[in-house]
């Protein structure tokens, strides 16, 4: 399963990726730092699942989802 990690906090992305390492069925195909970056990477990488922060500078995770034509499975990962 291809996964994309989306969070504006570098430490949060790094820690989540570390926690997912034991799950060999999950392949981290990329990271995004905001909604615009995520939109481009979702189109380019076509992940099966995204780990998505809600509160980010600019657009929120919810606003990102509204913009997508094809929405992958979503797991919200937020400290909100």
How would you name each of these model-derived features?
Residues 7, 53:
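Active-site residues of response regulator receiver
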Residues 10-30:
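Two-component/phosphorelay signaling modules centered on CheY-like receiver
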Residues 66, 71-80:
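A short, hydrophobic beta-strand element within the central beta-sheet of small alpha/beta folds
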Residues 45-51:
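Active-site beta3 strand of CheY-like receiver
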Residues 1-2:
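Extreme N-terminal starter segment of soluble prokaryotic enzymes
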Residues 56:
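Receiver (REC) domain active-site loop signature in two-component systems and cognate sites
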Residues 31-40, 61:
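Helix N-cap/capping motif at the beta->alpha junctions
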């Amino acid at each position: 399963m291809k996964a994309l990690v989306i969070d504006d906090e570098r430490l949060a992305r790094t820690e989540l990726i570390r926690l997912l390492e034991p799950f060999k069925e999950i392949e981290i195909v990329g990271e995004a730092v905001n909604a615009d970056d995520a939109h481009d990477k979702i189109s380019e990488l076509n992940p099966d699942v995204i780990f998505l922060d809600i509160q980010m500078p600019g657009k929120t995770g919810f606003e990102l989802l509204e913009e997508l034509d094809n929405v992958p499975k979503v797991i919200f990962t937020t400290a909100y």
